[in-house]
């Protein structure tokens, strides 16, 4: 059974299944699927998982661990991997089994991070398959926290203003 902090925003058409824990002020946006059916998923605080993203696990091998203040762009696939605090995954990107994106690391839009790869702190990776493009500037790394803050604030607006039964059958 999922464990969801009461301050998290879960869009009415998001699906959360199985052994999932979601931290405070986190936003799980419209059309997301968070599927901890065969292993655990842990999502930290003030993280935003944007519209149409799929988060899954690998049976008997890898859970999925997403830290605090993480931004995951629209339509990403996050599969059996670790995203450390204040990491960033661009729209449409795929992170595969056993991968790690370290704190302050970034995977660009539409990139494919192959199984077992690690993006070190402060690096931007992009492409198919993803490779290091360059080091991030301090300003870019600081923006990850700004992005997380903006989405956490938006999640709180939804939590306080959207009826709890929105989108549910009567």
Give the residues covered by each predicted segment.
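Glycine-rich hexapeptide-repeat left-handed beta-helix
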Residues: 1-3, 37-58, 62-66, 74-170
């Amino acid at each position: 059974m999922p464990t969801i902090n009461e301050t998290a925003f879960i869009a009415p058409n998001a699906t959360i299944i199985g052994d999932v824990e979601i931290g405070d002020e986190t936003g799980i946006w419209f059309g997301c699927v968070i599927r901890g059916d065969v292993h655990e998923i842990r999502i930290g605080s003030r993280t935003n998982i944007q519209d149409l993203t799929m988060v899954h696990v690998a049976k008997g091998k890898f859970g999925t661990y997403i830290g605090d203040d993480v931004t995951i762009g629209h339509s990403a696939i996050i599969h059996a991997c670790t995203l450390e605090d204040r990491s960033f995954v661009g729209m449409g990107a795929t992170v595969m089994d056993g991968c790690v994106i370290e704190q302050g690391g970034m995977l660009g839009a539409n990139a494919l991070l192959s199984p077992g790869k690690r993006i070190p702190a402060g690096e931007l990776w992009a492409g198919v398959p993803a490779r290091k493009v360059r080091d991030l500037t301090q300003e870019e790394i600081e923006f990850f926290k700004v992005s997380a803050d903006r989405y956490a604030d938006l999640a709180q607006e939804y939590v306080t203003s959207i009826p709890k039964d929105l989108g549910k059958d009567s």
